[in-house]
Structure formats: structure tokens, C-alpha cells
Curated annotation (Swiss-Prot):
It comes from European elk papillomavirus. Minor protein of the capsid that localizes along the inner surface of the virion, within the central cavities beneath the L1 pentamers. Plays a role in capsid stabilization through interaction with the major capsid protein L1. Once the virion enters the host cell, L2 escorts the genomic DNA into the nucleus by promoting escape from the endosomal compartments and traffic through the host Golgi network. Keywords: Capsid protein, Cytoplasmic inwards viral transport, Disulfide bond, DNA-binding, Host endosome, Host Golgi apparatus, Host nucleus, Host-virus interaction, Late protein, Microtubular inwards viral transport, Phosphoprotein, Viral penetration into host nucleus, Virion, Virus entry into host cell. This is Minor capsid protein L2. GO terms for molecular function: DNA binding; structural molecule activity. It comes from the Viruses. Its main location: virion. It is found in: Virion; Host nucleus; Host early endosome; Host Golgi apparatus. One of its GO terms (cellular component) is host cell endosome. GO terms for biological process: microtubule-dependent intracellular transport of viral material towards nucleus; symbiont entry into host cell; viral penetration into host nucleus. Highly phosphorylated.
Amino acid sequence: MAPRRVKRANVYDLYRTCKQAGTCPPDVIPKVEGKTIADKILQYGSMGVYLGGLGIGTGSGKPGTGGYIPLRGGGSTTSLSSKPFAGGIPLETLEGIGAFRPGIVEDAGPALEGILPDAPAVVTPEAVPVDEGLSGLDISRELSQEQILSFLHPEGPDDIAVLEVRPTEHDQAHLLSTSTHPNPLFQGPVQQARIIAETSGAENVFVGGSGIGSNAGEDIELTLFAEPRTSTPEVPIKRSRGIFNWFSRRYYTQVPVEDPDEIAAAGSYVFENPVYDSKAFKPAQQPDITLQDEASVTGRDAARLLAGPSGRIGWSRITRPTSLGTRSGVRVGPLYHLRSSFSTIHSPETIELIPTVLEDDTEVLTGVPERDTGFDDVDLDSIASDSPLLPERHHLAFGARRSHIPIVARPGVQTGTVIDTRQMAENSVYVSDNGGQESQQTPTVVINGNINVSMEYFRHYYLHPSLLGRKRKRLFG
């Protein structure tokens, strides 16, 4: 792979850093100091050829000691494009009224004269010069060292009509043109769709899809630190501290109570000591204390429904058993926090549901216990069975009919020739007796007719019951 080309810094930046160290490349110093071959050619050529202020040479482009000689007189001329505008009020209608003209610029002398009281306010020209036609409006400004302005004092009636005078012809109306160049990167061309449902010319551009290449970031799934206890969690209440915290073991003795009625009747029990019991002493009747509103009793006497540190909710109440007391009502003794927690509501058990609908491509597996079924595995590709056959009696029959030929065993009859023909009787037996001597001939059985011997193989097999197709069982209807 070719080495990657690293872009070099700017020539002027290199010149600032490497000039003092003397480590500049050979092409940096001549380019900055103007000592290249092209600069030298211009320097030597400018000695004999004057190029003026064109800025071609390496000079500053300033004029010589004598300066430049202007081709025109002093001042400047500005030309504006215009076109004739027809309209306005004809000058013939202003003969009796007069015309309002601006002040006349005159060279009256070195001093500036003030407003003359005898000067007329309106000057009526004898003849208005009419321009025969100009292609443009020429505005010239003459520069002079001293300019004197003369102002006219108005005279005559106060009601003077001031009209805008416009010649009938050859009026100059200036035009201002503005050109706007839209940026195609931010503003698409407006096109009309010629085909139905064509959206290629729409201005709305939707950019979608996935990015190409590797992403610089990493997708990390957010994890909740604590799940809400309710569907609409509220702002957690700040737990009280010190003596206001009923669950504090420093200020209260925690007493778990199983019966909530004991919390309601806390403080109403009176214990009598039989040693100091007296008939004259009658205990004061205690009022029935029930669960009341917290606003009607003090903060300690009211039973509250609080959530403990473990999160369980229960009834809580602060009580003080009978102890020492003063006449001012101050009682001395420990404080007990009676607490009766409710039973915990466990989350329901998760029961795996069985799908009621089976798709067509769902594979149903049926478990079959492994046991001996009494069937033998038969190889379907084998010609003969490997199982031993039981001996059975069979007979061989030829021909179209089935004829049984019984063989009668008689004593003294030796091996002979048995001939059976289709023209003879079925039960006829012919025996040739050779006198009791053994015959050297092989017994021959002759059967009339054409015998066609053919070899045919037949395969008879039965499928194992486990290979038979089973109907799919459905759980519901």
C-alpha cells in the first residue's frame, strides 16, 4: 500500500518557526522573501520596462515622484441607467400659477450673503428648456474652493400651490434591480409531478435508514435502580428524625402488638395492686379511647397508619404506661411505640400458560416409554429374512388344476418309475416290478405339457406400529 501523504503546513507558518532554527525546507525562504526565479525575472525586467501600477512586479505599486497625469478634469461623474417615463402635469397648465424652483448656486464673491428681504419668493421662468432626448441622466458635481448660496425670501399671498413638476416627455425614472441566487443545498427546485404518486420533485426530504460503518458510541440499556411500589408513585416523603421518628430505638421502646385493638385501647387499662387496695379508693373512670381523628387528639395519642423501615404498613401509636408524675402534669417514664404490622401481600405465583392455538408448522413431540414391544426389526433392503423359519409341510403343484397324487406304500415294492399323464385317471398308480433287485436307474417323473420355469421375487413386509402415522391430538375441541 502506498504511504499516506501528510499535508504540510502553510509556508508563512513554517517560515516563522524554522527561520531562526535554520531548519526550513529549500522552497520556503525564497517564496516568502521574494527570491524565486520568477521574482528575479520581474526585478531585472522592470529596470528597462515600466509596468506602472499594475501590480505585476514586486514593487509597492506606488506612482513615481511626478505622480500620475489625469486624463480628464477634476471631479467625478456617475451614470445611472434610466428609462423615459410618460406622465405628469404639462407645463402649459402652470403658466398662470408659476413654478417653484430650488435655489440657484452662484459665485457671488468671497463673502456669504444672508437672506435678502427684497428677494422674490417665486420666480416665473420665461421659457422652460426642454431636453430633446437623452439616453441617460448625467449628474455632474463641480468642485470649487468657495461656494456661495443665495436664498430667496418668499413674498405674496400665503396660499401658494406647491406642485411636483414633471415634464410630459423625457422624464428620467431610475430603476433598482435586485437579483437573488437560491442555494440548491437548502432549497430544492419546485417541480410539478406529472405522474400520479410521484414524489421525486417534492421539497420535503426524509432521511432515514441506518448509518454506514461503525458507530462511535455504544448502546447501553438503562437500568432502573428502584421500581415504584405503586402505579402512580408520589414524591417520597422525607423521614422524620429525632423524637419525631417513632421507629427510633433511642427515644422509644419498640413493642410489637398482634391485636390492633390493644393499640386503640392503649392507656385505658388500670392495674390495681391488691397490697395497697383500699375500699375508699375508687379509680377514676377512664373514657373509652377509640381510633379517632388525629386532629382531635394530640400527636402522640393518635394512632397512625405508617410504613415501617421494611416497607410494611401497620398501625402505630405512642403510649406511656403509669409512672411518676408531678402536679404540673409532667410524667416521667419511658415511651413505648406500639406497632401492629399488617400481613405481607406476596406476589402471585407465576403459572406457565399452555397455548390453546397450535400453528400448522408446530412440531408436537409425544413421549413414549421405552419398553419391549415384541416386534422384530426387519431390514427392508434384504432379500430374505434373517429370522429362522419353522418347518411346515408344503407341496408343489404344477398345471392349471390341483391334483393330489397319493403314494401307496406296499411291501415288496422297490423303487420304480411313476408316470402320471393328464389323460389317465387321477388315482391310477403304475409300478414296474424288477424282481426285488435294486435298480440302477433314477426314478423319473414325466409330466406332459410345456413347463415354464420363471424366477420371481416377492417381498412381503409390514410396517412397525411406531412408523405408522398418528393423528395429531388437539388439547381443546
